[in-house]
Regions:
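Internal alpha/beta core interface subdomains
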Residues: 19-32
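Hydrophobic helix-and-loop "lid/oligomerization" segment in the mid-to-C-terminal part
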Residues: 32-148, 153-184
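Short, small-residue-biased leader/transition segments that mark boundaries at the very start
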Residues: 1-8
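Short, polar/flexible loop-turn hinges at active-site or ligand-entry regions and domain interfaces
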Residues: 12-17
């Protein structure tokens, strides 16, 4: 998204040709990619956002794009409420019921806003297997941890699924993978 802002800034497209909704769509991509300018954010990111703002992007309209509904918030908090601390600074949630993938990912993100949490893992039942969503502030490489369970991603955002396994079995494997990660 920052790259698209650069395209406009380098005037490959005339500023007068950019619609407000286009500038807002690009700005919303930056907000999403950087998790509200807190992750992978540098000077070029802020420059692109400022440029899009000058093109007419309304930050309040962008914020409204990300508003959820009450039921979604309650679902996230129901997940967060079940979090257990592992190794003092890793939040782990193991749900025995099915869950929406987006809700699980948002809950994993939100767990990182709690003081002292360096990484979060949300495991939930899906059919005869388990889906996993993991987040980190960067100090813990969640990709490496989830690779041990067949997942992938990057150091701060990872996910995966394991078939023919219970949530309890997946949680045990996750805790083992976390221990192995910290032993190395």
């Amino acid at each position: 998204s920052r790259g698209l802002g650069d395209v406009y800034k380098r005037q490959l497209v005339e500023p007068s040709d950019v619609l407000k909704c286009e500038a807002e769509a690009l700005l919303s991509g930056i907000v999403l990619d950087t998790k509200n300018f807190t992750n992978r954010t540098g000077g070029r990111t802020f420059e692109a956002a400022a440029y899009l703002r000058r093109l007419g992007a309304d930050t309040q309209d962008v914020q409204r794009m990300f508003q959820g509904d009450l039921n979604s918030m309650i679902a996230r908090y129901d997940i967060i409420r079940q979090a257990e601390l592992y190794r003092d600074d890793i939040a782990v949630v193991a749900l025995d019921e099915e869950c929406d993938r987006v809700t699980a990912a948002k809950a994993a993100d939100e767990l990182l806003t709690l003081k002292g949490i360096r990484a979060s893992f949300v495991l939930y039942k899906k059919g005869d297997g388990v889906y996993m969503s993991a987040r980190s502030l960067g100090e813990v490489n969640v990709q490496v941890i989830l690779e041990a369970l067949g997942g992938g991603g990057n150091s701060t955002t990872a996910g995966g699924q394991a078939d023919n396994i219970t949530v309890a079995e997946a949680k045990a494997k996750l805790l083992e993978a976390i221990d192995k990660y910290f032993e190395n």
